Amino acid sequence: EPLRSPVARPTTRQQRKDRLAKAMTDVGLDPESANRFPHEFSGGQRQRIAIARALVTEPDVLLADEPVSALDVSVRAQVLNLLNDLVRERGLTMVFVSHDLGVVRHLCDTVVVMSSGRVIERGPLADVYGDPQHEVTQELLAAIPRIRVDGSTD
């Protein structure tokens, strides 16, 4: 579907097919499954399809809006690792939108914290996490579950 856009680069059916196969392979899916119905895929596979759809047009910037919030923990880790790999391998800039600052910590270099549609804090990850200036940022960071040495959580 994204390849049917007038701004998409491939012009022939074979070029579109090749681009789709590459995107599916890049996200860990078998290109032969391209004609399956959505209900035939797991939640993690559907998320990978969404990522492939975004990548198929070869963007410079990838907008990931809550890409793992509906996934279970093991699949979430796989998708986050995939996104991290894709950003590194393709030289992409990723705008990662999330309410989960625990996830943001592992994926982002720069953090922008918003509240009620306004930017309330921004900066390098180490600065925002190490010395949060805004009360909302402090509350969000305090809400990140932490594992204690004895294995229990806060």
Predicted segments, located by residue:
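Conserved ABC ATPase signature
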Residues: 37-41, 45
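Hydrophobic anchor residue at the start of the ABC signature
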Residues: 51, 79
